[in-house]
Amino acid sequence: MIRNNWTLEEALELFRMPFSDLILKAHSVHVQNFRNNEVQVAALMNIKTGSCPENCRYCAQSAHYNTGLEKKSLSTVEEVKTAAKRAKEIGADRFCFAAAWRNLHDRDLEKICQFVEAIKSEGLESCASLGMLKLDQAQKLKESGLDFYNHNVDTSREFYHNVVTTRTYEERLETVRNVQQAGIKVCCGGILGMGESTEDRASMLVTLANLEQHPLSVPINRLVPIEGTPMEGNPKIDNIDFVRTIAVARIMMPASYVRLAAGRGEMSEEMQALCMLAGANSIFCGEKLLTTPNARPEDDQRLFSQLGITPSRAACTTSDAQLA
């Protein structure tokens, strides 16, 4: 059952469940809403690297920190098309692209729409992560055929000031609402391991589950500490705590894809299998996610074979504009 009225205490009660009971409950919810043993596979490209004016304390691309990152200007349409073809070859059915900037500028909008069209021409779903977005920009992206827009809340409203101060929590939610109003599917999740408490994790999931519409994709990132950022020395989140968060996300947002995102490259096969048992049913493929390492395609193929998992197929690979 889809709910949009979760309380913090209800979410915390799920986190407090005995681990085996929680996993059993989450898996039961999962198989009621998705085909068991299917995982959606997405690829991610950085179309503009570095010099971001935001001060997100975890991010290698922030201009506020000296991380030694090589900066790169906006990609060309041909570069995006080539990357999309490669993503399809290694098994992706969704191609996501992200830019290190605060918000989408109108001067770049037409080129971004061309990126979407190039991706769709390869028979892939498209997803963009371009920072804050105005309603009219979202509508233009919808017209170009964009399927998904990613804009994470990162953490709880209460802990947020410890993560970033150049963008408010409400500004993040406003972008999510603009995307939903334009009719684009939302991809929205957060990052674990930034020093937040269990209550913060529960609060973040309550925020997501109480949106007017649940995000169709919920990426759960495991912090990859980057040298030169304020969070470079953060201890890694406990594996069981991470899996618990996956399970609670699955229960609270039963029809959403729960994605293992950043940090998966450092997870053992057993850890990934446990996450999938708890309800994770989407991954990023490719050896790099923006600026952090990811699992190799051959490792993913071996894992899928060991677990008897098959990639799911995209449901919207044709532009809505083409269908009109």
Swiss-Prot record:
Q: Which PANTHER family match?
A: BIOTIN SYNTHASE, BIOTIN SYNTHASE, MITOCHONDRIAL
Essential cofactor(s) = [4Fe-4S] cluster; [2Fe-2S] cluster
A single GO BP term for this record reads: biotin biosynthetic process
User: Is this entry keyworded 4Fe-4S?
Assistant: yes
Give the matching InterPro entries: Aldolase_TIM, BATS_dom, Biotin_synth/BioAB, Biotin_synthase, Elp3/MiaA/NifB-like_rSAM, rSAM
The pathway where this protein functions is: Cofactor biosynthesis; biotin biosynthesis; biotin from 7,8-diaminononanoate: step 2/2
What are the binding positions for [2Fe-2S] cluster in this chain? C96, C127, C187, R259
- One Gene Ontology MF term: biotin synthase activity
Q: Explain how, and how many, cofactor molecules are bound.
A: Binds 1 [4Fe-4S] cluster. The cluster is coordinated with 3 cysteines and an exchangeable S-adenosyl-L-methionine.
Q: What is this protein called?
A: Biotin synthase
Keyword terms of this UniProt record: 2Fe-2S, 4Fe-4S, Biotin biosynthesis, Iron, Iron-sulfur, Metal-binding, S-adenosyl-L-methionine, Transferase
Sites binding [4Fe-4S] cluster sit at C52, C56, C59
Q: Which residues form the Radical SAM core domain?
A: 37-264
Catalytic activities: (4R,5S)-dethiobiotin + (sulfur carrier)-SH + 2 reduced [2Fe-2S]-[ferredoxin] + 2 S-adenosyl-L-methionine = (sulfur carrier)-H + biotin + 2 5'-deoxyadenosine + 2 L-methionine + 2 oxidized [2Fe-2S]-[ferredoxin]
Q: Which family does it belong to?
A: Belongs to the radical SAM superfamily. Biotin synthase family.
Q: Which Pfam family is one of those matched by this entry?
A: BATS
Q: Which EC class is the enzyme in?
A: transferase
Function (record text): Catalyzes the conversion of dethiobiotin (DTB) to biotin by the insertion of a sulfur atom into dethiobiotin via a radical-based mechanism.
NCBIfam families assigned to the protein according to its UniProt record, in alphabetical order: bioB (TIGR00433)
Among Gene3D superfamilies, the record links this protein to: Aldolase class I
